[in-house]
Amino acid sequence: MQLKRKNSVFIDPRIQEVAGPCEPSDNGNNEEEDKIISIRATASSASITKESVPEAPPTHFIPVVVTVEPDAWEKFRDIIQVNRNIVIVKVGRWLMSSFMPGDQISLVNGTAIWNSDDLENQVRGPKKETKTEVTVIRVWNLKCLTDIQLDKLLVPPEEQLHYFSVKVYSSKGTIGLKLCLDKKRVLVELIRAKTPVNSALLVGDQILGINDELLTAKSKRALRKQVAEVMKKSIKKQGFAEIIACRQVIARSSPAPSLEAELSEKFANYAVGVEKGTRIEKKDSSETNSLPLHSDALEIALRELACLKQWIVESSTEVPPCDKGPTLMIDPPTAPGSAEGCPPPLVKAKSTTNAIERSVYFPLSTTAAVAILVSTPKKRSIFRQQDRNSAINFAEQPDHEKITSDIPEEDDLKKCEPMSGIAAYIKKKFN
């Protein structure tokens, strides 16, 4: 190893502890270039510390506080677009380093944001000279790209894309990722089940770089070589590889597993085959290339749950500060028989019909209603007694005077066999 000499001081990049300068030598030469610094190099495998693997929260979303400058806050609504659930769907280049599509705005300077009107009141309110703190609910393992990273991109950032960086941890040097080239874009073609990358990326994501090193390979073989070398080097040194990627805004932003992981949850045999390394029947490429998936109900529920958990305090049972509105509990209606205490019927706000006319609790004529009730039998025995008194008559049917036989003549009847005597007997009996 070659050491650099500068002013008689040896500089080693592996130095971790440097002792102070020694006492001057006995010859009295105190010049700086004659000083000797004792160096104890402690470069070893034990000195390289790797970052511990973080554990995903139960909701897969966490609150993140973002600071916005006063000049950017004035144009916040022009730079960022949100939907009716206060989820960001579009971010301008100015704030791409602070916000990303999929973030749900929950607080502004400690004030809860429940709808777009609340956000509009905060933005259009009095001009603020200090920075504004915006709390958003974001996927736990995704981070926004810095301005330096955005400026280094080969293609200028587009507002319809979701740019992010995510760390993929691995102890074996592999992450279970398969890439492909499509129109000079590096896309995720396949993600193996129960691998480090299945909670970080989705099939269809575009890989832009790894650890600030952009992918510039022009062939599939060169691409695989570049990705393998960069990831292997990063994982061996740090224990993880930071992937810079982007995806369409319509894709779900939750860390829900990719297609391979979803199949492993539904089909256990498939996941077992992946773990054992056995050969599995290759699926049609159209089944995997049809992703990314749209936002689903599970992602929305997890994001809302993470938003509500901000207000849960272990030592108290306080509820989020919101407009509760009128109570939904009403007194039950009384029994139909007494007009006192009966609540008025519900009537539409724009209806001109009188409330008394819409009432269904009491009939208009009490005597008529009683007469109807009396004439109506309460038991089935009354119907049976009425049936017994009624007479049943049958219409008289004409009697048959003669029964003819299939044999036309009497003489032919005598010529029949003895076994056919029953036919002659019947004819004689009824003739």
Swiss-Prot record:
> Would you say which domain of life the source belongs to?
Eukaryota
A GO cellular component entry from the record: chromatin
Tell me what this protein is called: Uncharacterized protein T15H9.4
Q: Which organism's genome codes for this protein?
A: Caenorhabditis elegans
